[in-house]
Amino acid sequence: MRRDPRPRSYRVSLAVAGLAVALLTSGCNDQPPTWNLVWSDEFDGAAGSAPDSAFWDYDVGGSGWGNDELQFYTARPENVSLDGDGFLAITARQEPYQGRAYTSARINTRARFEQGLGRWEARIRVPSGMGIWPAFWLLGANFPQVGWPACGEIDVMEVRGQAPGVMNGTLHATGYSGGGALTEQYTCQVAPSCASPPCTPLCPFSEDFHVYAVEVEANRIRFEVDGAIYHEVRQDLLPTGTSWPFGKPFFVILNVAVGGAYVGAPDVTTVFPQTMLVDYVRYYQLAR
């Protein structure tokens, strides 16, 4: 994103359809690993209630957030709350607020839940529209000490609202960040059986929920959409002089930005409000 619980076993299917590997295709014949669920937020609660404060904190302000974003992030229920149906709703609105023309929300698990190696996933329905920028991402917990990009960043899912059929998974660290980050696009796939009515296709991503995931290993990171691996980065193939900070603790960030260099400003075609719905966020560790 930045440019400048219930214990149970989970068997992950490593589907290879749509596989696009950054740097090297490797391990396609590996056996699927078995993951144990360690932590999750299922966003169950009364409509209008705040996300669980044991897990989530708010980023508040209208500083542009290093990306020339246009919104003011708030902690108001109008911008972030549970919807009463088991979803977290993050809503971007067009309204004057604290000198900005838009409001939205950005929440994080900093100092509440931070982990290193493992599998992170979320089931999300993204919003759409010119200038709308939803994201599910991880930031290194040592950001206050070392800064960005040295802390590392994993963008599990970013979508440009004007192109809601395409999403990106990206790594940022020292030696590969901003415009030089290690990124890969994934285009929403419509199954042949859903090519015509009465089946309802799940594309673009704004039409329905999809599971976005990243598996962080000691020297390899894999990105998935709906169980399909489309992006893999290996530490041993990085250029000399780059860093690999991804074995250290990271925390989760969920947000909907408005405007910024990545997506551009909203225009007359953009409909407000725009809401990102999150069914759950989960973290797994490999079974021992």
Question: Across the structure, where does each feature detected by a protein language model lie?
Answer:
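Bacterial N-terminal signal peptides that target proteins for export
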Residues: 2-16
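C-terminal motif of bacterial Sec signal peptides marking the signal peptidase cleavage site
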Residues: 24-27
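GH16 jelly-roll
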Residues: 29-288
